[in-house]
A protein has these predicted regions:
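PRPP-associated nucleotide enzymes
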Residues: 1-222
């Protein structure tokens, strides 16, 4: 499967992540467990995806027993986190935990129109000022199904002026992930916890893990 994917798509091989993904798929997993599993998977996935970030020296510091050491850090001032409402909110804290300093969070509200399965943007709080444009935008959205929502988010961030986009997703469908990866291949890296082969006629991943937003926010059957 991996050999046929675009080079900017990465599938986690971490055994703990794969085990947690199996737990998340289960219909018996409740909302509290779902929230915890999404967070834990995002931690594991994000750690791999952000391993390329540049480490820089920031002077000297001292340990509690009086020894001097070189203080290393990452410049987070030009990194922004972009959760796709609403289910992307479940992955925000994990990425904030991984990074060594606070980063801005800009929300994108996108939903999929039921008949056409095309994305509709209803909220966008990316700053208008070019001085506030991030170099790296990290999109968090647990599911990439048709890929259209992910494509719309990548387009918005590219137009905003970011240099690079990293997409973190718990689970994707091969057709949707492939489409999203082709939208801006030179500027986008997509990291997924797992991949399923296809979609239902309603655009749901199969076997998938259901509507993750409904599972996170207890709105099943709305």
């Amino acid at each position: 499967m991996a050999s046929s994917l675009p080079p900017n798509v990465h599938i986690s091989k971490h055994p703990c992540l794969r085990a947690k993904l199996s737990q998340l798929r289960s219909k018996s997993t409740n909302a509290r467990e779902t929230k915890a599993l999404v967070h834990e998977i995002a931690l594991l996935l994000g750690t791999d995806a952000l391993s390329y970030l540049h480490l820089e020296e920031a002077g000297k510091d001292e340990t509690p027993i009086g020894y001097e050491y070189t203080f290393e850090t990452i410049d987070c001032s030009k990194i922004t986190l972009v959760p796709i409402l609403r289910s992307g909110l479940g992955m925000v804290e994990a990425v904030q935990t991984i990074l060594p300093a606070p980063v801005s969070v800009h929300h994108l509200g996108l939903f999929r129109e039921k008949l056409t399965l095309q994305p509709v943007e209803y909220y966008n709080n990316l700053p208008q000022s070019q001085a506030k444009v991030a170099k790296l935008a990290i999109i968090v959205d647990p599911i990439i199904a048709t890929g259209q929502t992910c494509i719309a988010a990548i387009q918005s961030l590219k137009e905003w002026g970011v240099e690079k986009v990293i997409v973190l997703s718990v689970l994707g469908a091969i057709p949707g992930v492939t489409s999203a990866a082709a939208e801006w291949p030179e500027g986008t890296e997509i990291w997924v916890g797992g991949l399923d082969e296809g979609l239902t006629d309603k655009g749901m991943i199969k076997p998938g893990l259901g509507d993750i937003g409904d599972r996170l926010f207890l709105t099943l059957g709305k």
